[in-house]
């Protein structure tokens, strides 16, 4: 009886920690006139990430080939969310994946994954 009570107390104490570890790191990125804000996103390796992209003007896109994240397109009315779990530290460039005007090629950012 004493062992099962100890196990129950231990499980109750650890449960919030386990749930917290699975909670995604959430970031909202605004896109407008050839820039992402923020253009630098810091996340931790091994933890789920959820990035929501919103546009303030026209259609834009997001693509990060180095993290094998597929292209998404979004506009003012329809945001897009990308979910992933980075497995190794590093700096990964992302870019706008939808032609949005003359400054399109400058529309870049980086995802910095730390240990």
What would you call each of these model-derived segments?
Residues 1-10:
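Bacterial N-terminal signal peptides that target proteins for export
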Residues 11-20:
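Hydrophobic h-region of N-terminal signal peptides that target proteins for export
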Residues 23-26, 39-58, 79-88, 114:
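Beta-strand cores of secreted/periplasmic/IMS beta-sandwich domains, seen most often
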Residues 26-30, 48-52, 63, 93-95, ...:
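Soluble periplasmic/extracytoplasmic beta-strand elements of cell-envelope proteins
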Residues 33-36:
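Short helix-initiation/N-cap motifs at beta->coil->alpha
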Residues 69-72:
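Surface-exposed loop/edge segments in extracytoplasmic proteins
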Residues 75-115:
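Extracellular/periplasmic metallocenter environments
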